[in-house]
């Protein structure tokens, strides 16, 4: 089968300055391309965020593709305008080329090369709030689809998963993430008169050490050990002879599926309370750990990747969080996309040849789902 070329749509998408939460027409460009392929378009706007759901067909199997059109700020020092979509030496430059407008264009190209009268349903879940707080994006889309009984049966997310070569990695899970801001109050005073003061650091530091010294787990078959990192300690004190009035610290835990966010939050609070009674703990859970157990879905994806690249992809759970954490609560999900080495960097770029190869891989996935 001759694949459609993803490059023209990728360039059109890259020309939109869709830095979160701005869309700048990116989703309109995508909607126009999908409408031409017979998809119905449903616009979902929450707050400042634009989202769209595109759907074609009916019944089972119901396959979903999830992605985001928003990008991080470009920064400075690019060799080309980051929103000009310049092709040079076989590379397509632009903010979002890798993460992840390129993958969206590749999936649309795969759709364009295949009949529109397939059995079952194809849905695209596209948000403009993945790089930001992720409050009004994929999570809200899923809530809407769940309420209307229109959730996919399984889903592919086009995040850049590959490490060195296209085809080397499929993500089948992600670690959860929990952050804490701990504040201990004391009494300010002169260091020469400690009996007239109360040094909050002397309670905060033992609390932090107790947290740091705890081995949360030894890892699992699919996850590395959970990791707690202290990221800052602050008193706002610029004087070397003053005991501070308060001390605070920030920490983050990336945790595997042996834990839940609420359980870790309770552990943090209990540990801090033992060493620093009365301390305030402001805790936020940005995502739970999830795992799609290897099985028919991951095998289907792996076979499609191997058929195009000759590489058997590694099934992996490393890296940061993604919107797949929201999808996992509703259906099996895996992630596969481009090589991620240049994402979020100055001169983000994708080899045009890899973009076309990704379209072919996505096409092979569609062929296997709807054969």
From Swiss-Prot:
Domain of life: Bacteria
GO biological process terms, semicolon-separated: diaminopimelate biosynthetic process; L-arginine biosynthetic process; lysine biosynthetic process via diaminopimelate
CDD domains recorded: M20_DapE_proteobac
Binding locations of Zn(2+) 2: 99, 131, 344
InterPro entries in the cross-refs: ArgE/DapE_CS (IPR001261), Bact_exopeptidase_dim_dom (IPR036264), DapE_proteobac (IPR005941), Peptidase_M20 (IPR002933), Peptidase_M20_dimer (IPR011650), Peptidase_M20A (IPR050072)
Cofactor: Zn(2+); Co(2+)
GO molecular function list: acetylornithine deacetylase activity; cobalt ion binding; succinyl-diaminopimelate desuccinylase activity; zinc ion binding
Pathway this chain belongs to: Amino-acid biosynthesis; L-lysine biosynthesis via DAP pathway; LL-2,6-diaminopimelate from (S)-tetrahydrodipicolinate (succinylase route): step 3/3
Protein name in the entry: Succinyl-diaminopimelate desuccinylase
Species the sequence originates in: Acidiphilium cryptum (strain JF-5)
